[in-house]
Amino acid sequence: QNFNYIFEKSDDPLFHRQKVLNEMIMESDTEIVVNYDCDVILPMSSYESAYKAIREGDCDVVYPYGQGMYQKQVQANDGICSDFLMSRDYNHLDEVSKIHTSDYGWAQFFRKKVYVEGGMENENFRAYAPEDKERFYRFSMLGYKVARIKNYVYHLEHSRGENSWFNNPHMQSN
């Protein structure tokens, strides 16, 4: 079985993403795990290169997109997303994208052993927080082999709720 579904009900208005990610990491029985935001799409070659770099021992952590002007901000609607899913033609996304900066979030491939040894996700962060930068610096400073693939990340733009922007009630303590 390649897929396991777990549902965890919560009435807490705060989505404690880092805690949920840590629980999923510990449930995983694979050598490689991916911290993957649901609003991004990568070129297939990026998935393959990131996986291969860890599998072959070249890296412990891989950011499957470049740093700098490597984000394609996609202003997509349901029709464009459906067209892309049916055809797998990235031109559908490119037509409604603009280039923007990319840094630390979206997706990271990890050797699971390294992710656990390095402390996994920092549960002291709550809601929207600078956890993406903290994670990058922590794993780099701990001496793990962190690399990037110089390719684009497609970020599906969306509205922001209480848990997903700078104005969340926990930002000051993060």
Please tell me what each predicted stretch does.
Residues D11-E27:
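Glycine-rich, basic loop-to-helix element that forms the pyrophosphate-binding segment
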Residues N124-N174:
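C-terminal catalytic/acceptor-binding lobe
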Residues T30, D58-D60, Y144:
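Short, high-confidence coil segments that cap the C-terminus of an alpha-helix
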Residues E31-I41:
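Short beta-strand-to-loop acidic/aromatic patch adjacent to the donor-nucleotide binding site
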Residues Q1-D11:
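Acidic donor-binding segment of Leloir-type glycosyltransferases
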Residues R17-N22, D39-V40, Y47, D103-Q108, ...:
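Conserved glycosyltransferase catalytic-site signature
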Residues S28-E31, M120:
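Active-site acidic short loop of glycosyltransferases
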Residues P43-E123:
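Conserved catalytic core of nucleotide-sugar-dependent glycosyltransferases
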